[in-house]
Amino acid sequence: MDRPGETTHFGFRDVPLGDKQTLVNDVFHSVASRYDLMNDLMSGGLHRVWKDIMINALDPPRGDRPFALLDVAGGTGDISFRAAKAAGPGFHATVCDINSDMLAVGRERAAKRHLETQVDFVEGNAEALAFADRSFDAYTIAFGIRNVPQIDLALREAYRVLRPGSRFLCLEFSTVEMPGLDKLYDLFSFKVIPPLGRMITGDAESYQYLVESIRKFPKPNAFADMIRDAGFARVNWQTLSGGIVALHSGWRL
């Protein structure tokens, strides 16, 4: 639900709250076809390590026991494919993303991996999920929640669709905490990533937004408080690679 008159940030710009989703959609329509390649180039391949750590924390069952994962903002399927590889035959993932171009990439990748029966793709909004209460055994969101206009609504929706005893996991860029690395990281982010985006995708502005959006995202302790406010218990986090990213966890008890 929009909040008339309110503003939010789109990168370093202040925009009307109701406009942010359209602006974010335009970013991902523009970069969808080269999104995963850019992730490799921007992170030096480290995003693969971070995602594997997330899947290890998820620890999906390896037997026949049914296990339903909701992967939000997971359009290209990377998290769900990794989870399916780690899980047993009872595993099923639903990828929910608001961007149709990202979902198209994910569906194509699922077909190439012969995962159509284990992973399906649904266009939807993290702030208003079209799923019944207590439908899923886990909820993951990787590098997506900072793009949601109303993060508090998305967190409440995550809580709503999880069954009691289920886990919320969020992997997101964070605040670099290692002295010296912070300056190098800022230099790389603002001087290298947008030109790299122009070279690979033809779009520097989208990557300018992405690096700015990281700086506007709450610090790990503040984001943990938001997760608790949504109803989750046993909330904790770990920072990775000197604080470049953080993995937050919470449980619906």
Swiss-Prot record:
Catalyzed chemical reaction(s): a 2-demethylmenaquinol + S-adenosyl-L-methionine = a menaquinol + S-adenosyl-L-homocysteine + H(+); a 2-methoxy-6-(all-trans-polyprenyl)benzene-1,4-diol + S-adenosyl-L-methionine = a 5-methoxy-2-methyl-3-(all-trans-polyprenyl)benzene-1,4-diol + S-adenosyl-L-homocysteine + H(+)
In terms of domain of life, where is this protein from?
A: Bacteria
Supply one GO BP term.
Answer: aerobic respiration
Q: Which InterPro entries match?
A: SAM-dependent_MTases_sf (IPR029063), UbiE/COQ5_MeTrFase (IPR004033), UbiE/COQ5_MeTrFase_CS (IPR023576)
Cite the binding residues for S-adenosyl-L-methionine: 76, 97, 125-126
A Gene Ontology molecular function term for this protein is:
demethylmenaquinone methyltransferase activity
Q: What is its EC number?
A: 2.1.1.163, 2.1.1.201
Q: Which Pfam families match?
A: Ubie_methyltran (PF01209)
The entry's keywords: Menaquinone biosynthesis, Methyltransferase, S-adenosyl-L-methionine, Transferase, Ubiquinone biosynthesis
Pathway-wise, it operates in: Quinol/quinone metabolism; menaquinone biosynthesis; menaquinol from 1,4-dihydroxy-2-naphthoate: step 2/2; Cofactor biosynthesis; ubiquinone biosynthesis
Record field: transmembrane: none
Of which family is this protein a member?
Belongs to the class I-like SAM-binding methyltransferase superfamily. MenG/UbiE family.
Q: NCBIfam families annotated for this entry?
A: MenG_MenH_UbiE, PRK00216.1-3
The record describes the protein's role as: Methyltransferase required for the conversion of demethylmenaquinol (DMKH2) to menaquinol (MKH2) and the conversion of 2-polyprenyl-6-methoxy-1,4-benzoquinol (DDMQH2) to 2-polyprenyl-3-methyl-6-methoxy-1,4-benzoquinol (DMQH2).
- The entry's protein name is Ubiquinone/menaquinone biosynthesis C-methyltransferase UbiE
The uppermost taxa in this organism's lineage are: Bacteria, Pseudomonadati, Pseudomonadota, Alphaproteobacteria, Hyphomicrobiales
The gene it comes from is ubiE
